[in-house]
Amino acid sequence: MGRRLAEEVISVVECRPELRKISFVAHSLGGLIARYAIALLYESATQSDSHEECEKHDVDYYSKQHTLEGKIAGLEPINFITFATPHLGTRSHKQIPLFHGSNKLEKMAYRLSWIAGRSGKHLFLKDTEDEKPPLLLQMVTDYGDLHFISALRSFKRRAVYSNVCSDFIVGWMTSSIRRQHELPKQQSFINDGRYPHIVYVEKPKAQDVDFSDAMIYQAKTTSEMEEVMLKGLNRLPWERVDVSFKKSRQRIFAHSTIQVKTYFLNSDGADVIFHMIDHFLY
């Protein structure tokens, strides 16, 4: 997962020596692939090296401090953005809306997840080989020589775009990295004429999270693993953008409409893409 993407990034960077910055925008499973790829591409930076680089490019104090976080493929990490990505996997109750909360269907999907190959095992947290924690648990910390959380931390902006409803593949909680009680209530939804399908925006905020690396080994049940992933990822501030196509004729395709996969079928998601562009850091 993510190795081919990392190799492609390296090949592009080698061909384009003028590049200085890098951002990732990913949809669905691609968000998890991107998280793995940036861990492979992450390079820690010493303060002296970063200071010299900043002096060379004449950037402000904030950028100097940010550069100390490290680089991705030798470039300055700017935006890490995902659309409808199952950051917490799909094993937990109601994480796959298609099953309408049916425990029987969820258990059946869990048992048959091997059909989807390695990705299916990863998403259902069944990849417990050689007594290692499932990959998605490994990815909420720096595991071995893969600096998953350090790579995410190195980006100036981390944003998750999530479907509130009508996405039958990826649930709202897993795509927005929230607990059930943390989901915004409908009375809090906004009505923005510029972005009619964006109903809530949560600004990034630092959280005081009680997390230790040992937790990824201790978690055994589905709820324990989900809580560990939430704690691990929420050590970093995230911008959360909640999207609803409830009134759209294209709502049945919400999982693809959120990123306008095909204009003919998913054009109603254009305002979501414009929102991403308007808030993109450069």
Report the location of each language-model feature.
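Extended, polar/charged low-complexity intrinsically disordered and coiled-coil segments in eukaryotic
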Residues: 54-62, 68, 100-282
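Serine-dependent carboxylesterase/thioesterase catalytic core
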Residues: 2-133, 144, 156, 167
